[in-house]
């Protein structure tokens, strides 16, 4: 009998999950029913207390993984709709606002179609079209040629190309694609040499770091991008191109640094590599459509602010063009990572609940955030994010930390100037999440690379910790510098 069927029949795995879920439920109910004075927040309403309980539920479910991370996000939206919205049960609404400000149910459900979600969908559709047409293979072949045959240069080429692809294409898809390209290369390398380890490690490192380069590179970026640009919140007007302007140089620097570290720890014994990238490129009009649309979309993302077109609107371009030209079919839509989309939506809903019910405002007024040391907040938030993201989804980590830190930053006000302002803290979370890559479970690219059997967990931990902590330190230093020079705000 297959092992997975045995696990299901035995119930051992599910019993553990059930116990964790039950504990989470009990703690949530406890927080839900605590006396309001317990929280120490002046003016706290019943509705706001419910939001705190829902937030506690989200934290525990994401940390324990009692249910899948995307299911937690759906649960958040479900509980918000039924318990704190204007469409919840009447006995939960009270009469004439006696329980506090209720959320607009339409606004909660709109989190599934938030403009930033559309931005992500545009990125997913671009990736599907590039893979389907073979454009990704063509680009990889073209981009790797200048690096020649010298082993060290080939390694540099792969880590840079992986990083660049990960800015616009899912880092999971990028890692899978690039490792496929390396399969014939491994056959030519000594079985007991360190070159195989070096090349294999280059892929997840490149994919994880490269994701920092654009707002769509990884979900934590999208969270920070959304909060910083929210018209009802910080409204800083940071464009897609501005994000790339200060993050891409950081990414390139970290990729080159990672290349140097990998070479030092896992040097090649074979000095040259014969590289043959395998894959089909379809030479037809649809490939031309994909290529033109791909580059026009990227150009509009970069320069759209000057033309009056924002990044979210631009994301509809590839979706529409590929739909009416038949490049993307209904079946292709199944390839979109809907779990990630729903996870992001759940995080947005949490932020909406904290702001829409007035909880964030009351917390800012009642808790003396202004007395906190900005540097301590920056360091602790970064290290907590880095640590958590090594063990749980970095999307879940960002969804937990960014709403809290947004409130903290609003309460600290001008005192954050010493570290470059609120963007340093929030974008710093995105950086910390991307730098967390010490274990096979840390990120999907890590898991894919580990599954090849060419690297051991100790190899991944060694490179992941060194590159991750250096990336964290350098990334924060850069954010502080550009923040103090007012280069981030739109």
Where does each model-flagged region fall?
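Structural signature of hydrophobic alpha-helical transmembrane segments
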Residues: 42-52, 113-122, 171-175, 248-254, ...
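Transmembrane alpha-helix interface/packing and boundary motifs in multi-pass membrane proteins
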Residues: 60-68, 161-170, 204-216, 300-306, ...
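Flexible hinge motifs at transmembrane-helix junctions and intramembrane kinks/re-entrant loops
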Residues: 42-45, 57-75, 81, 85, ...
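Generic alpha-helical transmembrane segments of integral inner-membrane proteins
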Residues: 22-26, 52, 56-59, 78, ...
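Hydrophobic alpha-helical transmembrane segments
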Residues: 18, 22, 51-52, 74, ...
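Re-entrant/interfacial helical elements at transmembrane boundaries that shape
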Residues: 172-186, 200, 213-231, 319, ...
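Juxtamembrane and boundary regions of transmembrane helices in multi-pass small-molecule transporters
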Residues: 2-39, 126, 132-135, 191-224, ...
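Membrane-embedded alpha-helical segments and adjacent helix-loop junctions characteristic
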Residues: 8, 71, 75-193, 339-340, ...
């Amino acid at each position: 009998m297959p092992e997975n069927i045995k696990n299901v029949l035995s119930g051992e795995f599910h019993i553990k999950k059930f116990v964790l879920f039950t504990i989470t439920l009990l703690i949530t109910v406890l927080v839900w029913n605590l006396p309001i004075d317990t929280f120490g927040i002046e003016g706290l309403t019943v509705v706001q207390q419910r939001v705190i309980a829902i937030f506690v539920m989200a934290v525990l479910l994401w940390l324990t993984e009692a249910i899948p991370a995307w299911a937690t996000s759906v649960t958040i939206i479900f509980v918000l709709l039924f318990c704190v919205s204007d469409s919840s049960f009447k006995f939960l609404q009270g009469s004439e606002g006696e329980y506090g400000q209720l959320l607009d149910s339409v606004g909660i459900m709109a989190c599934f179609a938030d403009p930033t979600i559309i931005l992500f969908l545009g990125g997913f559709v671009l990736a599907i079209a590039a893979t389907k047409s073979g454009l990704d293979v063509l680009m990889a072949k073209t981009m790797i040629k200048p690096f020649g045959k010298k082993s060290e240069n080939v390694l540099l080429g792969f880590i840079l190309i992986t990083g660049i692809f990960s800015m616009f294409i899912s880092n999971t898809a990028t890692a899978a694609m690039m490792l496929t390209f390396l399969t014939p290369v491994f056959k030519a390398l000594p079985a007991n040499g360190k070159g195989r380890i070096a090349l294999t490690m280059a892929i997840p490192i490149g994919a994880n770091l490269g994701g920092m380069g654009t707002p769509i590179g990884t979900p934590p970026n999208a969270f920070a991008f959304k909060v910083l640009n929210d018209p009802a919140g910080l409204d800083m007007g940071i464009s897609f191109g501005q994000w790339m302007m200060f993050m891409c140089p950081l990414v390139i620097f970290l990729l080159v640094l990672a290349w140097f570290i990998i070479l030092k720890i896992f040097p090649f014994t074979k000095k040259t590599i014969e590289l043959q990238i395998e894959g089909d490129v379809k030479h037809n009009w649809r490939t031309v459509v994909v290529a033109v649309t791909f580059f026009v979309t990227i150009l509009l993302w970069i320069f759209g602010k000057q033309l009056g077109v924002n990044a979210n609107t631009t994301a509809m371009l590839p979706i529409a063009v590929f739909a009416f030209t038949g490049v993307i079919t209904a079946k292709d839509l199944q390839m979109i990572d809907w779990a990630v989309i729903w996870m992001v939506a759940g995080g947005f809903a949490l932020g909406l609940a904290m702001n829409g019910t007035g909880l964030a405002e009351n917390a800012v007024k009642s808790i003396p955030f202004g007395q906190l040391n900005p540097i301590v907040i920056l360091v602790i938030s970064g290290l907590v994010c880095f640590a958590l993201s090594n063990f749980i989804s970095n999307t879940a980590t960002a969804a937990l930390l960014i709403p809290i830190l947004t409130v903290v930053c609003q309460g600290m006000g001008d005192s954050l100037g010493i570290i470059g302002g609120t963007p340093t803290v929030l974008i710093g979370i995105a950086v910390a999440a991307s730098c967390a890559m010490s274990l096979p479970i840390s990120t999907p690219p890590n898991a894919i690379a580990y599954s090849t059997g060419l690297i051991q967990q100790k190899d991944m931990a060694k490179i992941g910790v060194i590159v991750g902590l250096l990336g964290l330190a350098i990334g924060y230093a850069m954010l502080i510098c550009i923040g103090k020079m007012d280069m981030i705000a739109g």
